[in-house]
Structure formats: C-alpha cells, structure tokens
Amino acid sequence: MSKTFNVNGICYPNEHYMVNIDSKLAQIKQLVDEKKYFVINRARQYGKTTTLNMLVKYLADKYTVFFISFEGLGETAFESETAFCGTICELLYDTVLYEEVPTIDDTVKQIIIDSIKKKAQDMLSLSSLISNICKNAEVPVILMIDEVDQASDHKVFIDFLGMLRSKFLKRSTRPTFQSVILAGVYDIKNLKHRIREDHEHQMNSPWNIAADFSVDMSFTRDDIASMLDEYEKDYKCTMEDCGIDL
C-alpha cells in the first residue's frame, strides 16, 4: 500500500509520510532513564499521541511500557473511586489482550489478567497492584496515559495522582513505575486548580514531583524537508514539479 500524508489522528510509519522524530524520542528516553515523571502538554495536532505510540517501541528494548488513554471514557469511569480503579485495571488488561506491550514477561501478564477477575476497589488496592506488577517485572515499568484532559473535572483523578506521588516518594523501598508520562492539552496543575479551590491545595499539587518537559515538539524546515524527500523518491518528482516552494 502506498504511503499517504495524514493530518487526522495517529500516524504510522508504514502507512504515512512522517517527519523523523528520533531525536525527540531520544530526549524523552533520557527523562525516562533518569526516572522522571512528567507531562507532555501541547495543543492538538502537535503529534503527542503519535510520539507516545512510537515511544512504546523505542523504549521496548529496555522497559515494559503500558500505554493507555482516557479518550472515550464516559462519566461512569470517574463517578467513584471503585469505578475509576476498575477502569484502570481494564485499560491495563486491554494492552495485554491486544498485545500492545512489546516487552512483558509471563508473570506480569498473569498478574494483570488476574486483576480483571478481581478488580481493585480503591486506591490502596490499585497501589498494591502497581507494586506487584513492578516487583515482578524483569525490567523497569513505564506508564503512559494519553488524553488526561478527559479526567480534568474529576477529583478521583487527582486522588490517583496523589497515590502515584506517594509511591514516587517511597520508591527507594517500594516497587513502582520507573517513569510516568501524562499527555494532554493542558498543564496538569491547571487541571487541579479547576477542582480544588482551597489555596493550600492549589499550591500543593499532587503532581509537583513532575520534571519540566522542555523537548521541542515542533518541526523545523529541515525536519519537514526530510519527509518530503521520501515522497519525492516514491513518486520520482520534486516539490518544484508539484508547484511547492520550500
């Protein structure tokens, strides 16, 4: 199948003409290697989801990567702690069911399969599940969550961040994720402000453990030119032939 240009949704290297983002992936991997928790917040059509999708494979030789998304979740997923924790279990299970985790050992796979039979009922049990996964994994575990804006108006999501923060602070003695990457349009601190009105809570965000994300997600002229070069080779033409001035 011939490749096409895609401006709607996720891009796949075998289907679409794409800018080479290896340098960006390498910079993000550096943050992961340093055990950073961080947020990628950029406007839509900035390639966040495509980048995360490619990051799964980029990290696979060294990490077990779970990539889930809150996109499409209804209000019932956030209406209670029990519902939210059960949803996280289901999202993790789906990544295993559809073989979306390139590097995962059988023990961890079975832990996640078992978790769907008896879903976590609260943050404490979800925390225990996370520790169990990370303790038994043969390589460090990464969690990536896309479309976190879907959870922006729900307190239970802030509680979830608080649980992850608690585990982050105790990670020298208790197994947890090597890195957590959240992606969305808005900064996670702004999401928190929309829920908590108390000044003390506003200044004490559960995500104040996050490192600054300074990777430039935009594309340079040279980046775009490399993508068009591939098109020229495929169609044996030049941009000038097409009336495009670079």
Residue map of PLM features:
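A short, basic N-terminal segment
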Residues: 1-36, 188
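Short, basic/glycine-rich phosphate-binding loops at helix/coil junctions
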Residues: 4-10, 103-109, 207
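The catalytic "switch" region of P-loop NTPases
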Residues: 9-10, 155-246
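A conditional alpha-helix N-cap/helix-loop micro-motif detector
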Residues: 18-21, 122-123, 239
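Generic hydrophobic alpha-helical segments
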Residues: 24-28, 126-130, 164, 228, ...
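P-loop NTPase nucleotide-binding core
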Residues: 30, 34-46, 50-158, 178, ...
